[in-house]
Amino acid sequence: MFKYFPTNYVWNLSVNLAIEMGARIGEIEEMCAPLQEAAKAPDAAGTQAFRATWAAMADKLCELAQEDEARGRLLSAGEKYGRAAAYYITCERLQAHGAPGRLALYERCLEVFSKGLRLAGDNCERVEIPYEGKVLSALYVRAQGVDGRAAPGRSPLLVQINGLDSTKEMKYRVGLPAWLARRGVSSLIVDQPGTGEALRLHGLTARYDTEHWASRVVDWLETRADVDPKRIGMEGVSLGGYYCPRAVAMEPRFACGVAWGANHDWRDVQKRRLEKEGSFPVPHYWSHVQWVWGAKDIDDFMRIAEDVHLDGVVEKIRVPFLVTHGERDSQIPLKWAHRTYDQLVNSPKRELKIFTDREGGVQHASFDNSINAGQYIADWVAETLQGRTA
């Protein structure tokens, strides 16, 4: 794990995530060098300072991209807009719920990200899935054939979902959809209830019965002529290590599942966090989880969290399932990966992969070095859904 700030895990997590999304080390230095003292400040003051330097860098990249556009250099402009979006979302996710300007910052990220995709000509399309009278926004990435072009006919697809505080743009830029596309597998990266646009723009909060929205996603995929409905899998990162196994257990149309970071008993994690055990993923943690889950107060949240566990659930999974975990995860103890794996008694192909110092990706959901872990997952999915690995 790259520890730019010696005493601030949350900020180091954010820097590492940004690097995984394509941040440049010179820009990291320019943004972070003025923040050494702010990193020691209370959450409110510190996160405002973090936002100021990171948003300024994103603004500068957008100005440079506009200069590229004016000269007809659209590919370069698209790359800069994409990197700017990564910096916007990095500082947005650290802000407190309701912080002045947070929503505008998020909307700016969406705008810049979309422009970056278009100008760069990326294999990525924004789509919307009807849900509860609103929509779940998602990014659709098409499988590639061996010649690098869009694969003909119906392709296997992996639905990819967020954790507690990630967004579809973050997951896209980390790289799993591109790695899958090269292996002949399409991707649908979803802002499910409690995350991204669903939470910020539509007020859709998280729910423990994830099959409620996951089934609607499968319904939508079954209408597409380029998706093989018999080869739809799901992957979840971080808290998605709860969301995904639950959905795969309860929605029989999923053909496989992957937990990128196990999260078997999130209710227990909350109890430990109340006792100051384990690392927090974001500042303002308790107000953040209440917002995500639509809780009135901390007591209401703890009641909601009582349902967020996989005991009695994982046994219902009857398709291949991969559980991965970082050996040095300081947010979610490794024991929960073993618990999920041990309860996958009815899966015809279960696997537990623990990432060690040798491979890298030892931190929570491999945020410290995602490429080896992510490509391991991509290979497993391709093998399971009949894509290709060569």
Show which residues each predicted segment covers.
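N-terminal cap/lid segment of alpha/beta-hydrolase-fold proteins
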Residues: 52-54, 58, 104-153
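Primarily recognizes the serine-hydrolase "nucleophile elbow" in alpha/beta-hydrolase
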Residues: 89, 220-275
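Alpha/beta-hydrolase active-site loop
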Residues: 204-226
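Mobile cap/lid helix-loop segments that gate and shape the active-site cleft of serine hydrolases
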Residues: 273-313
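Short beta-strand/loop motif that positions the catalytic acidic residue
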Residues: 317, 323-325, 329
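Short alpha-helix in the alpha/beta-hydrolase fold that links the catalytic acid
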Residues: 319, 333-343
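Catalytic histidine neighborhood in serine/cysteine hydrolases
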Residues: 341-362
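Catalytic active-site module of serine/aspartate enzymes centered on a nucleophile-bearing elbow/loop
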Residues: 367-390
